[in-house]
Amino acid sequence: MENNKKVLKKMVFFVLVTFLGLTISQEVFAQQDPDPSQLHRSSLVKNLQNIYFLYEGDPVTHENVKSVDQLLSHDLIYNVSGPNYDKLKTELKNQEMATLFKDKNVDIYGVEYYHLCYLCENAERSACIYGGVTNHEGNHLEIPKKIVVKVSIDGIQSLSFDIETNKKMVTAQELDYKVRKYLTDNKQLYTNGPSKYETGYIKFIPKNKESFWFDFFPEPEFTQSKYLMIYKDNETLDSNTSQIEVYLTTK
C-alpha cells in the first residue's frame, strides 16, 4: 500500500513538472509585445518624410533571377533594372545566408534605398535593399493568398483589411511593405510631413516560430539605409498560417 502511494506521488509530480515545463516553454517561445518605452515616437523624428518616400512608392520586384556578383561575402548583386537603377544589391545578415541564394533562381521583393548604396566604382545607376529574397522554384501559389491584418488604434480594435501574396513562403518585408502602403494610402500612417500617429508597430505571428515585430517609426536621427536594416535577417513566414496585427497610438 505504501509503495502504491509513493508511485502515485511520483506520477503526480511528473505530470506537474511536465505541465509547468510546457507552460514555461510556451511563454519563452512567444516573444513579448514591446513596452511603450521601446517604441520610437514620431513627434521626435526629424525628416519623417524620408520614411514616407520609402513606402509611398513602388517596391523593387523581380522574379526568377540569379545573382551575378558579390561585393562582400554577405551580399548579392543582380543585373536587373528598374526606373532608377540597372544593378541591384541585396545585403543579408551573414555569408551563410548569402551562400544559400547565390547562383539560385530567386524572387526579389524589397524596399530600396539609393543614398549610401555602394556596389562598385562604375555602378552609377544602382539600388540597394536588405533581404527580400525567396526561392523561385516551387514557392508560388496558383491562387494568391489573402492575409487579414487586424488594426488596433489606442487600444481599440478599429479595422481590418486584406493583403495578398502569391508566395507560399513570403518575406516579412513584402508583407510589411504592403501593410504600410495600405495604411499610408488610407490612414495617413506616413505623409510628406508629420504623422497623425505617435507610435506604432506591426506584429507577425507565425504558427511554428516565435512572433516578432517592427517599429513603424525610426529613431530621431536616422538614415533610410540604417532603418531598412530591419529586413537584413530576411525573415520568412508561411503565408497560409501566419497572422498579422498592427498597433497604433494617436497623438
From Swiss-Prot:
GO terms for MF: toxin activity
Keywords, in A-Z order: Disulfide bond, Modulation of host virulence by virus, Signal, Toxin, Viral exotoxin, Virulence
Keyword Isomerase in record: no
Keyword Amino-acid biosynthesis: no
InterPro entries: Enterotoxin, Staph/Strept_toxin_CS, Staph_tox_OB, SuperAg_toxin_C, Superantigen_bac, Toxin_b-grasp_Staph/Strep, Toxin_bac
Pfam families linked: Stap_Strp_tox_C (PF02876), Stap_Strp_toxin (PF01123)
Miscellaneous note of the record: Binds to major histocompatibility complex class II beta chain.
The name this protein goes by in its record: Exotoxin type A
Organism of derivation: Streptococcus pyogenes phage T12
